[in-house]
Each structure stands twice: as C-alpha cells, then as structure tokens.
C-alpha cells in the first residue's frame, strides 16, 4: 500500500512541476521600463546588490525617478506546433 501512495505523490509532484514550468515559460521579466513608469522597489540609498536581492532592477542614470524598480512582466505567446 505504501508503494501506491509513493507513486501517487510522485505523480502529483511531477504534474505540479510541469504546470509551474509552463507558467514560467509563459512570462518573462525585463528591466526595460520607461522612467516615468517605474514602480519603486527600494528605499533611499539602496545599492544595486540590495535591489537585485529583492528581484528588482537598478538604473541610476535618470534623476528624479526610482532607481530600484520592479521589472515589467511580459506574456510570451506559446509556440505553435507546425503541422506538416
């Protein structure tokens, strides 16, 4: 009986991993964000490494806007299978 439970658990883990992998492929993040559209992710004086540790983008080339900001999430359309 224990082996059947182990197989069920393994199958559920495998299905969950595949589902999460598909979701991860469907979205990608980019640090290409217009300065006026940046959403603050840091605090005054945040360093590039502190910002990166939060999973955010750092760009201090534009004054008056957040330097540590959330990346844009872009939906990537799934690849279509070609039928020959």
From Swiss-Prot:
Keyword vocabulary terms for this entry: Disulfide bond, Growth factor, Secreted, Signal
Outcome when changing residue 37 to K: In a gastric carcinoma sample; somatic mutation; abolishes inhibition of gastric cancer cell growth; abolishes inhibition of apoptosis in gasterointestinal epithelial cells; increases invasive activity in epithelial cells
Highest taxon above the source species: Eukaryota
Domain P-type: 29-72
Signal peptide: 1-24
MF term (GO), any: growth factor activity
Chief site of localization: secreted
Compartments it resides in: Secreted
Disulfide bonds: 31-57, 41-56, 51-68
Effect of residue 55 to V: In a gastric carcinoma sample; somatic mutation
Entry GO terms, CC: extracellular region; extracellular space
CDD domains: Trefoil (cd00111)
Biological process terms in GO annotation: carbohydrate metabolic process; cell differentiation; cell population proliferation; maintenance of gastrointestinal epithelium; negative regulation of cell population proliferation; response to immobilization stress; response to iron ion; response to peptide hormone
Subunit structure: Heterodimer with GKN2; disulfide linked.
Protein name: Trefoil factor 1
Source lineage: Eukaryota, Metazoa, Chordata, Craniata, Vertebrata
């Amino acid at each position: 009986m224990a082996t059947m439970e182990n197989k069920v658990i393994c199958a559920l883990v495998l299905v969950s991993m595949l589902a999460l992998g598909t979701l991860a492929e469907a979205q990608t993040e980019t640090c290409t964000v217009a300065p006026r559209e940046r959403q603050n992710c840091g605090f005054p004086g945040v360093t590039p490494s502190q910002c990166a540790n939060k999973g955010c983008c750092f760009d201090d080339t534009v004054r008056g806007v957040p330097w540590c900001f959330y990346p844009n999430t872009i939906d990537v359309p799934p690849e279509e299978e070609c039928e020959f």
